[in-house]
Amino acid sequence: MLGKARELANYQDEPEQLPTGSFGKNAFLRLGFERRPERTVLATLHRRAPLIVQQALYWDEGMPTLPCVSIISNAGGILQGDRYAIEIDLEPDTQAHVTTQSATRIQEMDANFATQTQTQTITLGANSYLEYIPHPIIPHKHSRFVQQTEVTIHPTATLIYSEVLMAGRKYYGTGELFHYDLFSSKFHAAHTDGTSLFTEKFIVEPARGNVSRLGAMGSFHVFGNLILLTPKTHADRLFETIDPVFDMDEGIAWGASRLPNDAGLLFKVLGMESAPVRAAIRKIWEAARQEVTGASLPENFLWA
């Protein structure tokens, strides 16, 4: 059970407000995509506030048959004692784009912790294609957050999964850089036959170690992570196009590596601000879409 993770041992006390996981603090979202003759549709939608999805929209000019879904929260952020669960299921030959309405703010905490049980369970059938590109995560002072993502993917399917972690509210008051208590993220992928592909887990506890040391964040403030699960032929071609960058003048660094078991690619980027980090992720996202689907990525919205 995610709440029993070792890094949460010191955060088991109950909030003085609503109890952990009670009504309004136990969100659930299930998205099921199916193929219709003319396009992919959002055929299954189960939601429990504060997570909300209204409907799929088809605004992507590069892929007009691609359902685009924005996940909305009416809670103003993730609070102590919250328990969120998200399930995304793609049937064979489907395509989908899932994002969030805005940045995910993990509010300041004085008791317990919050989980986004991104036990996110993501399942991709044969020849399916999913872009999961949420907005950044902003952990506030003393926040504690754990997320776990379990992916089951067919060998012919493709997943583009990204996350961007901010250092905190950088421009709030005198600044909050790495003032959160805990951020833990685990990602595990397996094929549909049960074969495990890889697991990545990182735990950040700024009070227990210098996050700004060499080998961690260094002098950077924003961390971006893109996981591309795709057939080896696509991964090989994309890997040859990605050159590592380390440019302190521009405040950006990135690089790519191959995932174990020919699962795909891992792309990591560090920056001083969120915009350059997201732009670097978008560049890889665009190249991956072009490689896998042959479609282009439309220009970014001015407000994105």
From Swiss-Prot:
Primary location class: cytoplasm
Gene Ontology, cellular component aspect: cytoplasm
Presence of the UniProt keyword Chaperone in the record: yes
Annotated GO MF terms: nickel cation binding
Keywords, comma-separated and alphabetical: Chaperone, Cytoplasm, Nickel insertion
Pfam families for the chain: UreD
Keyword Cytoplasm applies: yes
Entry's localization field: Cytoplasm
InterPro entries, A to Z: UreD
PANTHER family: UREASE ACCESSORY PROTEIN D (PTHR33643:SF1)
Function text: Required for maturation of urease via the functional incorporation of the urease nickel metallocenter.
Subunit structure, as described in the record: UreD, UreF and UreG form a complex that acts as a GTP-hydrolysis-dependent molecular chaperone, activating the urease apoprotein by helping to assemble the nickel containing metallocenter of UreC. The UreE protein probably delivers the nickel.
Similarity comment: family membership: Belongs to the UreD family.
The protein's name in its UniProt record: Urease accessory protein UreD 2
UniProt lineage: Bacteria, Pseudomonadati, Pseudomonadota, Alphaproteobacteria, Hyphomicrobiales
Gene symbol of the encoding locus: ureD2
